[in-house]
């Protein structure tokens, strides 16, 4: 055998022995409200190749809100739940659920608001007297905010679970529910045409402005088995959020994914969802959340420092 043929054969053998890239690890993600900006983070990061850069592939399930997200995480159907309500998560852990918080999802809640059809006489949430007020699912951040409005404003109201935003729009416009909930950019088009009117934001409640209201969750067994994978996920997640606020490709991709109108999306970015609201590192306002959890009977007593340390395990550098 000639030297050239020998070297060629050796090159082929070596190339077969050296891996050309590890197979991506698949994570199952529960994301709320398909089409929302926050809920689109996994999908847009996947499209942009950011998660693949961290050897991750995402299998994304869309839920109708934080309550449903909590359920699918605890059932083991998914690895990570995005945007679960803080109080629902505290309550589940307090009742013995092997739950872990691995990052914040939303802080300040400027993007969540309540609205009425144009024909409604209501101009403000403080005027509510016996009307029905929508929230997504039990234990979700929208549910807790409705309870806060009722408590702080002394309202007589009927909280009603209406599911996701499209379902809520149908129920409000058909007269089944008096006051709808939404998260920007949904319903902003109805506000701009005068078909609907905003009567409150979650951030109208002072304590919520500095409070983390939604978190990312996993099960204790999943965190133990996939700690490194979840840490990589959180890094890729944050890199995706940075990309969404800096890349000229982000908004066009989001428009294609969500089917929403560009003016509403641009308004959302200007006035409703600043980059800092999507930080993941700190669970802010935890003391206030604990008080709320006890007041609204998600917890019978506050969690101890030892319990909080076990519950909240945000990966370093995420």
Residue map of PLM features:
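Bacterial N-terminal signal peptides that target proteins for export
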Residues: 1-9
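Conserved C-terminal helix/tail region of periplasmic/extracytoplasmic solute-binding proteins
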Residues: 293-318
